[in-house]
Design a protein with these regions (language model features):
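Catalytic pocket-lining loop regions of alpha/beta-barrel enzymes
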Residues: 106-107, 120-221
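Active-site gating/metal-coordination segments in enzymes
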Residues: 49-50, 58-139, 143-145, 151, ...
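Short active-site segment of divalent metal-dependent hydrolases/proteases
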Residues: 9-10, 143, 176, 228
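Mid-to-C-terminal alpha-helical segments outside catalytic/metal-binding sites
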Residues: 1-5, 15-50, 98, 214-221, ...
Length: 262
């Protein structure tokens, strides 16, 4: 089964606005419009069987609406695997985590940079204590700021990993968008999965190969970061640049199946 573990779709009322915001922040012109129908078409063209759909509440008031959206996707679209969201400022986290678990939500997305908290915030540590091993935890990591100044970075995630050994942790963007040297130093060998999203455009072949070897085939997951990138194109580039065999690609896809219980 082929799985894209890093995609985003948005409610039709806000999709255009969010896609524009992504372009403004990252300077990347998105290939997609952020709608489920577009993602569905692209995943079918790429031979992707299922997509993990991610959202991150940028304010406490967004937690319930965002998770309602995730639960509705879970109920209505078997090809999508939605992750839930939490926020350090949300007051009734245990109840909301219970609700997500009861509705079959398998994971949580954390984006400290967009959500307005640091990865070393004690409030995030409190959330992780509640999470235990109930959810797969996918973290956005990295940006253009130096690690010590950025809300997320490989060093902070390594500290989280050490403090909370139970949950499956995924570091997006091959361990840290624009923080790849730090990812090699801080995260490789630390029982952290990495996904390939938003990395093909920014890594040369040598660094991509180094990251792949350092984390190991059994800890690499395929992710496109739709709507920024297209799964078919990203899968093709990943396969060619790393010279992956069919067995390599099957193993990478099996990693996602395994951690998602599929």
């Amino acid at each position: 089964m082929f799985i894209d573990i890093h995609t985003h779709v948005f409610h039709p009322k806000i999709a255009h606005k969010v896609v524009d915001q992504l372009e403004d922040h990252y300077g990347i012109h998105p290939v997609g419009n952020g709608l489920m129908e577009d993602l569905d078409t692209r995943m079918n063209s790429a031979g992707i069987d299922k997509c993990v759909v991610l959202a991150a509440a940028t304010a406490p008031a967004q937690v319930i609406p965002a998770n309602n959206w995730a639960i509705s996707i879970k109920q209505e679209h078997e090809e999508f695997i939605p992750f839930g969201t939490v926020h350090t400022g949300y007051k009734d986290l245990e109840k909301e985590l219970d609700r997500l678990e009861e509705n079959g939500i398998k994971g949580l997305k954390f984006h400290p940079d967009f959500q307005g908290f640091r990865m070393d915030d004690p409030a995030l540590y409190n959330i992780m204590e509640m999470v235990e091993d109930r959810f797969v935890c996918l973290f956005h990591v990295g940006d253009t700021l130096p690690p010590e100044e950025n809300p997320s970075c490989p060093r902070k995630l390594a500290a989280l990993r050490e403090a909370f050994p139970k949950p499956i942790i995924i570091a997006a963007h091959m361990g840290g968008y624009r923080h790849w040297d730090y990812a090699l130093d801080q995260l490789a060998g630390k029982d952290v999965f990495v996904d390939t999203s938003s990395s093909m455009d920014f890594l040369d072949d040598a660094k991509l190969e180094t990251l792949y070897r350092a984390f190991g085939r059994d800890h690499v997951l395929f992710g496109s970061d739709y709507p920024l990138f297209d799964a078919g194109s990203e899968l093709d580039r990943l396969t060619k640049r790393l010279k992956l065999t069919a067995a390599d690609l099957d193993a990478i896809m099996e990693n996602s199946c395994s951690i998602l219980g599929l």
